[in-house]
Every structure is written in structure tokens, then in C-alpha cells.
Amino acid sequence: SMETKNYFFHLTSDPKINPSAAMMSIFAASEALKQGHSVTYFAAGDGTRILLKEVIENLHTVTPHGGGTSKISEAAKNSLLEFSKNGGIIHVSEGSIATYGVNQDNYKEHLIDVSKIFWSYPKQLIEESSKADIVFSY
């Protein structure tokens, strides 16, 4: 049987400008979790926008992947929700996402309904990534 690893995915790219980075980060993190690994997904900087409903639900408007239908947006959203529901850990940079008017008081209005969010800072970024065997950065 395969050895379990700790994976750390760091998304800082703006999903509206680099949708491929956002989608690949989600699909790779989901796959690592499905294969039985421990997986942390840390969104920071412009990457925090991936959790915004209006952004993830409209990825298909900024990428040719998925043929321009909303299927690719739905796949990304569902993958992230499933990732969260099945034990994937999601961190969001609290300072970064505040730039977009989202905070711990109003996030339920703005973000997709992931099971749990860790509101984090550079301290947690370093602590969590230092536990990883493998780091992906998008």
C-alpha cells in the first residue's frame, strides 16, 4: 500500500486572471485527498478570491477549458466543497480576503459553503507548510 504524505497547496494567483492555476490547484488537492493523503489548501493574496461564490461560479467566463459552459465552474466548486467535506483543510489569508470586503462576520454571504475555514496569517502559512512532504504553489 502507498505511504501517506502531507500535501500543501498554496494558491496566490487571481482566479479571474489565471483560472488554470486556480482550477489545477483544486483538482490536484482533491485528487491527493482521494488517494488518502493529508491535504491542506491555503489561499492567500488574490488566490483568496477562489472561495468567493461570484468568482468560482464564473470561472468558465475567463477560460476556454470546459468549452465555455458552466460545467468547469461547477466542477471546481463541487471539488472544493467535497474536499472540505471529506477532511481537506482550508486556510484563507484573513488579511488578503479582507481586501475584497470579506471577514469572519460576513463570509457566509460571500463564500462558498465549505465545511470549515481556518482564518490565517503568514505565521500559519509557515507552520502548516513546514509539516508538508510535498508543496504545490500556484
Model segments located where?
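Extreme N-terminal starter segment of soluble prokaryotic enzymes
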Residues: 3-8
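Histidine-anchored nucleotide/phosphate-binding helix
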Residues: 21-35, 41
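A glycine-rich helix N-cap at a beta->alpha junction
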Residues: 59-95
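Short internal beta-strands
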Residues: 39-45, 90-94
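A short aromatic-anchored loop/beta-hairpin motif
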Residues: 79, 83-87, 91, 98-129
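Short, glycine-rich nucleotide/cofactor-binding loops
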Residues: 9-22, 45, 51
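N-terminal beta-loop-helix "entrance" segment that forms/cooperates
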Residues: 47-60
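Short, basic, glycine/proline-bearing loop/turn elements
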Residues: 11-15, 60-68, 106-112
